Regions:
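Catalytic histidine-centered segment of alpha/beta-hydrolase-like enzymes
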Residues: 233-242, 246
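Gly/Ala-rich beta-loop-alpha elbow adjacent to hydrolase catalytic centers
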Residues: 85, 89, 93
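Alpha/beta-hydrolase fold catalytic core
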Residues: 1-17, 38-41, 78-79, 247-260
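Conserved acidic catalytic loop of the alpha/beta-hydrolase fold
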Residues: 64-81
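Flexible "cap/lid" loop of the alpha/beta hydrolase fold
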Residues: 94, 98-99, 104-135
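Conserved alpha/beta-hydrolase catalytic His-Asp/Glu region
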Residues: 118-123, 136-193
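Conserved HGGG/HGGXW glycine-rich cap/lid loop of the alpha/beta-hydrolase fold
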Residues: 8-55
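Short beta-strand/loop motif that positions the catalytic acidic residue
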Residues: 195, 201-203, 207
Length: 260
């Protein structure tokens, strides 16, 4: 039996499971873990396979990542859950929802989802792979060089520091495998259009990895989705503008809890 992914948890109530991006581990949701627990939710943030203390998987593809996430939900005996996915984690959330929609009550997709086209995916992945090669796998140097390129003009300095620290802790081999896996997400609009759970799509207006146009396109595909853009944030909205992000998240959870 495969080992369960490592996770942190705080609070009790309906489970909100947070799935981080390729650019960091569970720490990239640290502010939200505390905020959600204080609002009466059970906040869980995982380390994706190959990150933190979570065992890697081979092949490193969305099928295996989704299976690891579903195994964690099953082990926690907490389904259906709210999935909050950032970046690559948003794609994992979508893959889980496609494979086992009964496990997912609602979704929050943050700065992530299918790319508009191959060039958009290259714009996301290639600078990271180039930085990985240029720094010879020195993740601290990579993080210090990369994070400022993708944050917004109004980013909270503490959030930028946390994003930088989280990326510096990623294993270089896992980072490369995760980046290479990004382009393999192949769920079509027709498949995603069958996901009827309430969904909040939130991103930074200054995000050059997943720009507002990409998130708006995803919002048009999902039947029960709405899109929100935080004006001065980049690729880490939950860290760059935690007040704006947490407020939108809390409102969405409260309203969908009443309506659904």
């Amino acid at each position: 039996m495969a080992l369960l992914p490592h996770f942190s948890t705080l609070g009790s109530g309906h489970t909100v499971l947070m799935l981080h991006d390729a650019d960091g581990g569970h720490l990239t949701f640290a502010p939200q873990v505390e905020a959600l627990a204080s609002l009466g939710y059970r906040a869980v943030a995982w380390d994706m396979p190959g990150y933190g203390n979570s065992a890697p998987i081979e092949p490193y593809r969305f099928k295996g990542l989704a299976e690891a996430c579903m195994a964690l939900i099953d082990a926690l005996q907490c389904g259906p859950v709210t999935l909050v996915g950032h970046g690559m984690g948003a794609m994992v959330a979508l893959e889980v929802a496609v494979r086992q929609s009964a496990l997912v009550r609602r979704m929050v997709l943050c700065a992530g989802g299918p790319a508009l086209d191959a060039q958009a995916m290259a714009d996301w992945v290639e600078p990271r792979l180039a930085a990985l090669d240029a720094t010879q796998g020195d993740m601290q140097s990579l993080a210090q060089a990369l994070v400022p390129q993708f944050t917004g003009s109004g980013a909270l300095p503490e959030g930028v520091r946390l994003a930088t620290h989280a990326l510096s802790q990623v294993y270089r081999g896992s980072y490369r495998r995760a980046l290479q896996a990004l382009s393999t997400f192949d769920r079509s609009a027709g498949v995603l259009g069958r996901l009827h759970m309430p969904t909040l799509i939130i991103g930074g207006a200054q995000d050059r990895c997943t720009p507002p146009a990409a998130l708006q396109a995803l919002a048009h595909v999902l039947p029960d989705a709405r899109h929100l853009s935080l004006p001065h944030a980049g690729h880490w909205p939950q860290l760059e503008d935690p007040d704006g992000f947490d407020g939108a998240l809390a409102d969405f959870l409260a309203s969908s809890r009443v309506l659904h």
